[in-house]
């Protein structure tokens, strides 16, 4: 079997805030002062352990020995040599042992500040004891810092997940955007005197500590605190915005509902950290109301009807989700009252087939499960795949069947195509049957004898420079990363490996929700044809194809013999991807905005090159009933249309709350 070399970066840990700049720092022995050295040592140990378990060769590459990670990213890169299945199994085992260390914050409102500090501005001793206890239970280090000392800190988590139902909608919005909208609410004076509670650790530890601190603040205010034992998979469904209000479990001004991380069993943590239990919902409020709410929870859980939706997402993208998108995944679940279950191998870290990437969505309604699948598809579209093929000599055979390269790579991995049935003949040529059953034969891509193991250092350097995951095979390279990093890696690799083939074919795969396909391609493929014309694609030098991947996702396949043309095609296609906005306008003035026979709204859509839809039922859980969509190249028009409609509503005497403005 052909040898492969897989290079992937280890998530960089965040630098902890300086204790000398904080008003308080909890006692925590779980993280070393040099967190980079701790992660590096942990990675080395896991690489040695994995190399003993699997028939692979593993090397750990360090960019700068002793260099501070604050000045350089992608410090650690692991390369694994072996067959296709083993290199990805090794990757799973290694990444499942390396936690992503990050920083989160909680903005203290003025009433809360008075509960934590005495008249002289010092933190109460009892408060420090409580925070030290939370650190001991969760494993997250806690700081109290003045806002002026937090400018250089890279906060990597949202401040709204875990309590989307906290208080009422207006108060929830205020909590989520307290820091970013202080100027809008004319609170600059308070902003200069505000304080942050900063949390440092892995995702689960940080989120458990943050929710416990919120419950502690409520307890200091005199509210009762109750923990309700609930299955993790039921929590986002029961307390999500799309279900809780109809079940009578929505938070009020006197009741707060907090949820813990839903996918904690799939997220790596340090072995020395205390075990955490996410199977509970924390509610705070008046004791009598909490008792009624607790009964409502048990009743809803017993009579809950679940709907299941299965979608497929590349297993490589699922890794990125668990490493960098956990907060967004949690928010998607909360907003759509759904639970996303990942494949079991993410929990076990064992051997798996990389093609097994089915994700199950459980929700309270079919509509919510479909919305969740759509949000996942949009999240997946942030990441792109690239390929470089060496030694392709016969361009006509390569292009004879549309997308033959894509199918050839599918055959190589042992995956059958849904559109064409393919077999490999005894002579090594590929035989396909077209839609009417006729056989079509063409020559396979030439296999070069490139020894991948001799170029481990080269792909490790490219991986460090770009942060892109790379897979080197005997006749090509595969890339995975974001749209701004994959072209960089492809360019560097093509220059290093140019000697292995005068003819290099390049390919970039973009993903998008199936419902956006008509929007991206345009009427009668007008937008697609225009992009091909701008980038000078023709049958001989490449093409852009739309290929269905699953019921919810399709792939934009861009390939050519010139890398510059492929990159230009990718950038041009991304400008045609939709940008959208939801906001609220009173239903009473919808007809006025539309105008007689739609003349008014048609003028607006033509002026701002946008699609506008009004609805009597909200598009999301925030009550927004207006949807605007436009190509990404005109994304600034979204705000112009929103401003026009809001001003029209206010001119007619309607007062629209700011928390319903846009999302």
From Swiss-Prot:
One Pfam entry name: KH_Mug60-KHD4
Species, as recorded: Schizosaccharomyces pombe (strain 972 / ATCC 24843) (Fission yeast)
An example molecular function term from Gene Ontology annotations: RNA binding
GO cellular component, one term: nucleus
Origin organism lineage: Eukaryota, Fungi, Dikarya, Ascomycota, Taphrinomycotina
GO BP terms, alphabetized: meiotic cell cycle
CDD domains: KH-I_MUG60_like
Subcellular location: Cytoplasm; Nucleus; Cytoplasm, Cytoskeleton, Microtubule organizing center, Spindle pole body
Principal location listed in the UniProt entry: cytoplasm
Protein name: Meiotically up-regulated gene 60 protein
Domain of life from the UniProt record: Eukaryota
Cited function: Has a role in meiosis.
Domain KH, chain residue ranges per copy: 578-644
Keyword set includes Chloroplast: no
Keywords carried by this UniProt record: Cytoplasm, Cytoskeleton, Meiosis, Nucleus, RNA-binding
Claim: 4Fe-4S is one of the keywords in the record: no
